[in-house]
Amino acid sequence: IPVLNVVENMTLPVQMDGRKVGEERLQELLKLLNLEDRKNHLPNQLSGGQQQRVSIGRALMNAPAIVLADEPTGNLDSRNSQEIMELLKLSNKKYSQTLVMITHDENLALQADRIIAIEDGRIARDEVIRR
């Protein structure tokens, strides 16, 4: 949201739900997302990768059991895309969250534990990735 700084953007869902923002959770996410030194910046003062990390922070603020990520790296270069993917994987492991990600990027999809490919509205492939 363009008129809100990083902290305000990340805590918006908690505040809209009428709950108190957990300062410890906020600080943990700011550190995890490498946004501690940018917490008072507005979106137009952030890079595309930083803006995407703010969005991830907003999604993680409520500690959901399932994170839905629709093209989370769609507008990012390959370096920032990989950074975002690493953050999502870390969140998956650290907080035991299920990550459902929609992507057209085969390289990102191959980093998943399971791939379900959909073609013409039907499941074309469903496979568990063994490492």
Model-derived regions: residue spans:
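Conserved beta-strand-loop-alpha-helix hinge in the C-terminal portion
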Residues: 122-131
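ABC family nucleotide-binding domain
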Residues: 1-118
